[in-house]
Amino acid sequence: MIKLFVGLGNPGPEYEATRHNAGFWWIDALARDWKLNLVPERSYHGLAARTNIGGQSVWLLEPQTFMNLSGKSVGALARFFKIAPEEILVVHDELDVVPGQAKLKFGGSHAGHNGLRDIHAQLGTGDYWRLRLGIGHPGVKSEVINWVLKKPLKEQREAIEDAIVRTLHAAPALVAGEMEKATLIIHTSKPPRPKPPRREPGDGGTPATA
């Protein structure tokens, strides 16, 4: 059961549309879906909103500490409300996944992501859920920092937005703790193919109109 949805990014208008802020885009979209307003919460060093689903409090959080101090925000809220690491989902940009795809993962290393690195440190564990939104890789390691801090091309942004829309459908399953169902929704990168037109018996292959 997910009780805390965290989106990673950097605060400020100059970073708003950059690849590194894909996690913020996801939380913004979820807040719109759930008709919530993210408001500054100084105690948790971020923008936050709380709702009630099935009698359970669920939080949305966007740390405003800059990426490499994200754990300060996540840790503060999680500790105060006694939210366990396994009840946290962190949504972040992922270099090793192409735009338009997303991957749900539990645990593991921070893989060099500075936001995850600090969350690991503040929670004292890597045993929390991550939703990895693909932003693609520049192809050269030396270009990674420049890549994540730039805006994606129009078609890349559209692909990322498509992934956000699709993965938001998994939110109810994530809250309910139905992780297999959530994984199926998130990892289905394309809608199912439409069924072929129905044919009337013996019509010689012409699609039926009724």
From Swiss-Prot:
**Principal cellular location given in the protein's record:** cytoplasm
| An example molecular function term from Gene Ontology annotations | peptidyl-tRNA hydrolase activity
User: Function, please?
Assistant: Hydrolyzes ribosome-free peptidyl-tRNAs (with 1 or more amino acids incorporated), which drop off the ribosome during protein synthesis, or as a result of ribosome stalling. Catalyzes the release of premature peptidyl moieties from peptidyl-tRNA molecules trapped in stalled 50S ribosomal subunits, and thus maintains levels of free tRNAs and 50S ribosomes.
Keyword check for RNA-binding, yes or no. yes
Quote the EC number.
3.1.1.29
Q: What is this protein called?
A: Peptidyl-tRNA hydrolase
Q: Give the positions of the site Stabilizes the basic form of H active site to accept a proton.
A: D93
Organism lineage: Bacteria, Pseudomonadati, Pseudomonadota, Betaproteobacteria, Burkholderiales
InterPro entries given in the database record: Pept_tRNA_hydro, Pept_tRNA_hydro_CS, Pept_tRNA_hydro_sf
Q: Which reaction does it catalyse?
A: an N-acyl-L-alpha-aminoacyl-tRNA + H2O = an N-acyl-L-amino acid + a tRNA + H(+)
The protein's UniProt keywords, in alphabetical order, are: Cytoplasm, Hydrolase, RNA-binding, tRNA-binding
- Residues the record annotates as the site (Discriminates between blocked and unblocked aminoacyl-tRNA) are N10
- Organism per entry: Variovorax paradoxus (strain S110)
Similarity comment: Belongs to the PTH family.
Annotated GO CC locations:
cytoplasm
